[in-house]
Every structure is written in structure tokens, then in C-alpha cells.
């Protein structure tokens, strides 16, 4: 049931990104505060190798991804969403690939050019909120 809820949230969020381009994009991210950690990626093209690697890793590590309440906001250069959020995260000039991890508290936890998901999991697992989640898991 929890998986269905998480997946439903992810699908609704993806639909919102494309359907509501006039809504302030910071508001879209605020919807996830306290419920999800958000990986925002900025890529210069859909075929960007770092972007594709991250998407592949999300599928490969889907259980670990869901366990950490992650959602992925995938932004391609030239779109309205990219423009708005790149300003919010102070991206300047041409960006080949940039990944920003936002914690459940709404704060930026990581800004990197790496798309290594296991490294992101390791970082998340050191966060106080995640440590509390681990202690309450029943597996």
C-alpha cells in the first residue's frame, strides 16, 4: 500500500511538472517537504550520459530508492522548469549535468556533478531524520 502511495505521488508530481508551468516551481518542491527527499537533476539534453546513468540506477536500486522516500525531478535545459529552478539553485552558464539533493526539511544537502546513486544513499543514511527512519523500520 505504501509503495502505491509513493508511486502515485511520483506520477502526480511528474504530471504537475509538465502541466503547471506557470505555477512557481519552488511551490512544487515545497509539496514534498517532510514527506520526500528530492533529487533534482539539470541536464543539457535528454541523451546526457549522467542523466541516463542516474535513471538506470533508480531502476536498478528501486527498493533502496523507495525506502529513502526519494523522488526525482528531471529537468532538461531549455524548459521553463529548468529556467526557474536553475535560478533557485544558482546555476550559472551552460550546465552539462548537475544534481541537487533536497532533504525532507527542504534544505539542499548536496550539489554535485556526479550521478552515483549509492553515494547519495550513503549520504542520506547519515542524516538524522533517516537515522530515525532506520530505527523505526520493521525489517
Residue ranges: model-predicted function:
Residues 2-139:
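Non-catalytic interaction/Regulatory regions outside core domains
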